[in-house]
Swiss-Prot record:
Cross-referenced SMART domains: CA (SM00112), Cadherin_pro (SM01055)
Residues that span the membrane, as ranges: 692-714
Gene: DSC1
Propeptide positions: 30-134
Entry function: A component of desmosome cell-cell junctions which are required for positive regulation of cellular adhesion. Required for desmosome adhesion strength between the granular layers of the epidermis, as a result moderates epidermal proliferation and differentiation. Is therefore required to maintain postnatal epidermal barrier function and normal hair follicle morphology into adulthood.
Protein name: Desmocollin-1
Free-text tissue specificity from the UniProt record: Strongly expressed in epidermis, less in lymph node and tongue.
Organism in which the protein naturally occurs: Homo sapiens
Stretches assigned to the Cytoplasmic side: 715-894
GO function term, MF aspect, one: calcium ion binding
Record's subunit section: Binds to JUP/plakoglobin.
Top-level taxonomy: Eukaryota, Metazoa, Chordata, Craniata, Vertebrata
Record-linked PROSITE patterns: CADHERIN_1, CADHERIN_2
Length: 894
């Protein structure tokens, strides 16, 4: 297929140059590429081709460092204008950028000129284009963007070699034909001419990739589909523009000349790396315009300062009207404008200063925590920042610390206050020198003659006032001796009335005396001891005992001072040790003694240790370092408690004897000992009793036996001969008038206590039983029956004893009255027992009505007692003599 074009001469020249002058080298990734080219290159000449994908596959931006060369996406290198190479090599770089991955690669291209001589013999490696068969593929065609026509506009023609043998019909497909944008291109099927129907915007379509087809009438395709690339040539139809209409930058004031302020960026939609997108920047106007403080680099758009005199206090904001123009800034290039705002950052370049050169104020003496003066300052730096916030200092005149100055955060004023009382009698005025600086460091301190601190003078006048007594010094120390006796006087606290410069008329009182050691003389302030001073008291800290004293004048004004009594140590305490130690036989056979002396070190160790003679048989004591001793067994002792008398003497000979309890135990550590507690065991003494002690024990035992024997003899029971009461009844029938209602009984339930009388003796026996009231007992001897009847009313106990040696008697001697005295308590007891319930508990207190015989009550019924089943233990009445059976029948329920 032959290529037909509108300009066959120019196409032929390009093919010749391409075949003779161009050398294309496919190189390794991102390495140098060497190309040999003719010394004279025309515009739009293909120089060579590099492999871009091997260096960076996803390159979104391809540009050349030399504007004389243009790089296509496939790696082809074209010249943008006529170029003449000297004999030396010429090099440039191809930059590949990936915006998403933020990667950038560089390919170095080196061009070397060669002579225009045709080689005698062409080798395959020297051939720029190898052609084994005539191909029907044309070179890429191009169309001008925004072309004005006329339309349809011829693009190019394709022809197939098969047209010599067949009737060929041509067709195309792809974007612009049967894809968006539709119907932009079409082809004449008979001739193969391709036409464009309308103008094209390159910013939408940079190129079109079409496919051409050659087929016969019957559909046979003698050729493969032909790729057709139609490139849209860029037209400078887009003016550059700033991404932001207004851009804001900041820069510190007083910065050096050449300081970078910021970089402006403009965008041009035309084809990159061409004159259409070669932009130039410049400043059209500065507001305010005098003096000129800024400049811009025309190619990079970086704005820098031109002077070091940017002063925020004069102007804090500048505006720059910027212009960006393409075509390398040529007047015919397209341009646009934007606004840049530059704000100056504040620096501490202005020190604060007082509004007045000096100040005068006054304050009453003895006043504290009062504000006496406020001082204002002025600062031109930015308000409410560390560059303008003031810090005040008192430089001179405050040696005693009477004043303090601070900053009011709301007004930035200096507030002068009195924190310690001033004395008019000592000084009537105070002159202070006050300085002020900023919180931030002054920025011009090293390069400027401006002072960083402003100072002023403050005169403080002190006003006299009638003040109270002064306790000076606040703490007074006096010396005393440990063990100082009671009733002695010590020098006390003295206060002063500053108005009269003496302590006359002042009265003193105690405010604090923890252990009440002293009393104070209210007129002189001297102390008098109430107790012996003891340095070892818990109220003494570091050998000092504190007393608070208040001095009061005539009108009630007062001051308070502290009197410290320093006690010098006196050797009044002997060394002390623990009362009990433990020796573990499984670990060691000794115990370590560590005495403690409450006195000071000068009255303490070294100590001396002595054993009593009675303990030397089993024990031995060894001194170690004057502070401790070792108590050791002479031989293994039994597991028990032992008492060991030990004497300990301090360095001045004060000695104390201690009875040390030593616990000898079968253990490894004292905490493992399981011997019973000391309070429940016997301590084995090591002291032998003397003869006088033994004699005293014997005499005491004899005396105790004598006392017990005497008490036994005195309290022995006497034997009283028993006798029988006379009885005049002599078994005669007694008229009891049973047919009548009987005698009136005023108390049915006769309760204890009851009185008894002994028939044989006129003496009465009354005993007391604990918790049961009075116990009464009656005894009757019945000669004939041979029994004695005892009635024990307090505890309810009844006994019947045989009377030994009594076998005779006259039964008629018993009188009726005596038997009545016997039966009346017994009947009362029976009635009392009938008043109990089935569990033998006492019944509730209630009145029981008893009817007369024959008036509704059953025979033999006496009320609540008729239902009882037990015989109350009266079986002994069955063995009485006949004369007692009548009484027994009366007592026993049938």
């Amino acid at each position: 297929m032959a290529l037909a074009s509108a300009a066959p001469g120019s196409i032929f020249c390009k093919q010749l140059l391409f075949s003779l002058l161009v050398l294309t080298l496919l190189c390794d990734a991102c390495q140098k590429v060497y190309l040999r080219v003719p010394s004279h290159l025309q515009a739009e000449t293909l120089v060579g081709k590099v492999n871009l994908e091997e260096c960076l596959k996803s390159a979104s931006l391809i540009r050349s460092s030399d504007p004389a060369f243009r790089i296509l996406e496939d790696g082809s290198i074209y010249t943008t204008h006529d170029l003449i190479l000297s004999s030396e090599r010429k090099s440039f770089s191809i930059f590949l950028s990936d915006g998403q991955r933020r990667e950038q690669q560089e390919i170095k291209v080196v061009l070397s000129a060669r002579e225009n001589k045709s080689p005698k013999k062409r080798h395959t490696k020297d051939t720029a284009l190898k052609r084994s068969k005539r191909r029907w593929a044309p070179i890429p065609a191009s169309l001008m963007e925004n072309s004005l026509g006329p339309f349809p506009q011829h693009v190019q023609q394709i022809q197939s070699d098969a047209a010599q043998n067949y009737t060929i019909f041509y067709s195309i497909s792809g974007p612009g034909v049967d894809k968006e944008p539709f119907n932009l291109f079409y082809i004449e099927k008979d001739t193969g001419d391709i036409f464009c129907t309308r103008s094209i915007d390159r910013e939408k379509y940079e190129q079109f990739a079409l496919y051409g087809y050659a087929t016969t009438a019957d559909g046979y395709a003698p050729e493969y589909p032909l790729p057709l690339i139609i490139k849209i040539e860029d037209d400078n139809d887009n003016a550059p523009y700033f991404e932001h209409r207004v851009t804001i930058f900041t820069v510190p004031e007083n910065c050096r000349s050449g300081t970078s302020v910021g970089k402006v960026t403009a965008t041009d939609l035309d084809e990159p790396d061409t004159l259409h997108t070669r932009l130039k920047y410049k400043i059209l106007q500065q507001i305010p315009d005098h003096p000129k403080h800024f400049s811009i680099h025309p190619d990079t758009g970086v704005i820098t300062t031109t002077t070091p005199f940017l002063d925020r206090e004069k102007c804090d904001t500048y505006q720059l009207i910027m212009e960006v123009r393409d075509m390398g800034g040529q007047p015919f290039g397209l341009f646009n404008t934007g606004t840049i705002t530059i704000s100056l950052e504040d620096e501490n370049d202005n020190p604060p200063s007082f509004t007045e050169t000096s100040y005068v104020t006054e304050v009453e003496e003895n006043r504290i925590d009062v504000e006496i003066l406020r001082m204002k300052v002025q600062d031109q730096d930015l308000p409410n920042t560390p560059h303008s916030k003031a810090v005040y200092k008192i430089l001179q005149g405050n040696e005693n610390g009477n004043f303090i100055i601070s900053t009011d955060p709301n007004t930035n004023e200096g507030v002068l206050c009195v924190v310690k009382p001033l004395n008019y009698e000592v000084n009537r005025q105070v002159i202070l020198q006050v300085g002020v600086i900023n919180e931030a460091q002054f920025s011009k301190a090293a390069s400027s003659q401006t002072p960083t601190m402003c100072t002023t003078t403050v005169t403080v006048k002190i006003i006299d006032s009638d003040e109270g007594p002064e306790c000076h010094p606040p703490v007074k120390v006096i010396q005393s001796q440990d063990g100082f006796p009671a009733g002695q006087e010590l020098l006390g606290y003295k206060a002063l009335d500053p108005e009269i410069s003496s302590g006359e008329g002042l009265r003193y009182q105690k405010l604090g005396d923890e252990d009440n050691w002293f009393e104070i003389n209210q007129h002189t302030g001297d102390l008098r001891t109430l107790k012996v001073l003891d340095r070892e008291s818990k109220f003494v800290k570091n050998n000092q005992y504190n007393i608070s004293v208040v001095a009061v004048d005539a009108v009630g004004r007062s001051c308070t001072g502290t009197l410290v009594v320093h006690l010098d140590d006196y050797n009044d305490h002997a060394p002390q040790i623990d009362k009990e130690v433990t020796i573990c036989q499984n670990n060691e056979d000794f115990a370590v003694l560590k005495p403690v002396d409450p006195d000071g070190p000068e009255n303490g160790p070294p100590f001396q240790f002595f054993l009593d003679n009675s303990a030397s048989k089993n024990w031995n004591i060894e001194e170690k370092d004057g502070k401790t001793a070792i108590l050791r067994q002479r031989q293994n002792l039994d597991y028990n408690y032992y008492s060991v008398p030990i004497q300990i003497k301090d360095r001045h000979g004060l000695v104390a004897t201690h009875m040390l309890t030593v616990r000898v135990c079968d253990c490894s550590t004292p905490s493992e000992c399981r011997m019973k507690d000391k309070s429940t065991r016997d301590v084995r003494p090591n002291v032998i009793l003397g003869r006088w002690a033994i004699l005293a024990m014997v005499l005491g035992s004899v005396l105790l036996l004598c006392i017990l024997f005497t008490c036994f003899c005195v309290t022995a029971k006497r034997t009283v001969k028993k006798c029988f009461p006379e009885d005049i009844a002599q078994q005669n029938l007694i008229v009891s008038n049973t047919e009548g209602p009987g005698e009136e009984v005023t108390e049915a339930n006769i309760r204890l206590p009851m009185q008894t009388s002994n028939i044989c003796d006129t003496s009465m026996s009354v005993g007391t039983v604990g918790g049961q009231g009075i116990k009464t007992q009656q005894s009757f001897e019945m000669v004939k029956g041979g029994y004695t009847l005892d009635s024990n009313k307090g505890g309810g106990h009844q006994t019947l004893e045989s009377v030994k040696g009594v076998g005779q008697g006259d039964t008629g001697r018993y009188a009726y009255t005596d038997w009545q005295s016997f039966t009346q308590p017994r009947l009362g007891e029976k009635v009392y027992l009938c008043g109990q319930d089935e569990e033998h508990k006492h019944c509730e207190d209630y009145v029981c009505s008893y009817n007369y015989e024959g008036k509704g009550s059953l025979a033999g019924s006496v009320g609540c007692c008729s239902d009882r089943q037990e015989e109350e233990g009266l079986e002994f009445l069955d063995h009485l003599e006949p004369k007692f059976r009548t009484l027994a029948k009366t007592c026993i329920k049938k």
